[in-house]
Amino acid sequence: MYYLQMYEKVLINTNITRPYLARFTKYQYLCHMIFYFSGTGNSKWAAKTLASETDDKLVSIPEVINKDCSFTLEKGEQVGFIFPIHGWRVPNIVKEFLTKLTIKTEAGDTPLVKHYCFCLVTAGDSIGKAMERFLQQLKSTTVGDSLSLEAVCSLIMPESYVGLPGMDVDKKEKELEKKELASKQLKEFSKIIKQRYPLGNKQIWGWEQLKRGPIPSFFSGPVGGFFERFLITDKPFHVDSRRCVKCGICANVCPVSDIKGGLGYEPEWIHNGKCLTCFSCYHHCPHHAIDFGKRTQKKGQYFYNKLSK
């Protein structure tokens, strides 16, 4: 089980396959968990689907990252991580979460006992060497003393990054094709997680099958560094007042609370350095009133439950 100390919200289990949020509950005990982050819904779909198969409980990283949280696992319990790839690297919010995450084992465990851990990532095309970077950070943080990464998976999902020329959402046919293939791969991965299939020789299941793409070291290295330094920013975001209806959706879907606004107000980006450039605000705007400089003009929108035009 795990112990999560929170002061405003905690996850509670009211249905074995449907975790919900409750306010004003201080303590809650749950077991097997999946930590997930999602911007436009691809990773959230994967997390919810996998949790329904494995009976894992979902923990939203944006919901807990600013809380003082601590987790205790009993013998045999597992942990999963699910998130999208940003610029062929691990998203900043996930990297920050790993540095804050504390997992303790039950009193009877020895320091040599590690809990089963898996990681699933989503991307529109390829992941480069993002999984290598995730594993490296996992091992370098305190939580790595308690977890052993045993299975990995990469799902190629519909495109959502629209921040550069030539990058746009997929056509409807391509979107459906990616979703269909991802569903099959996720079902296979869920079987592996439930069986905890042992490979031996310190191998990680699915490692060789990851969709790294061409020259992965280059994309996760220099290109990824360029993304983090120059393209992960909220500065180019702006709203067209002629189309904005002040619905507040953009502020509500921002995973890092970087948008000041709400019902009755136009969005105002706070520039607090937390923006992930996940484009959740852009894609969820019902009137397409948000743009990222001039780079998103005449481009499409996408989030998981909405088919591209």
Language model features with spans:
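Active-site-proximal loop/hinge segments that shape catalytic or ion-binding/gating pockets
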Residues: Y302-L307
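Residue-level preference for short coil/turn positions at secondary-structure junctions
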Residues: Q28-L30, E74-G76, L112-K114, T233, ...
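Acidic, Ser/Thr-rich low-complexity intrinsically disordered segments
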Residues: I215-V256
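Short, positively charged and aromatic/hydrophobic N-terminal segments
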Residues: Y2-Y3, Y7-I12, P19, R23, ...
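Detector for intrinsically disordered, low-structure N-terminal pre-sequences
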Residues: K9-L11, L21, L58, T142, ...
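FMN-binding flavodoxin-like domain, especially the glycine-rich phosphate-binding loop
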Residues: I34, S38-A46, S52-I65, L73-F83, ...
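Iron-sulfur cluster-binding cysteine motifs and their immediate structural context
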Residues: V239, V245, I249-L276, S280-Q297
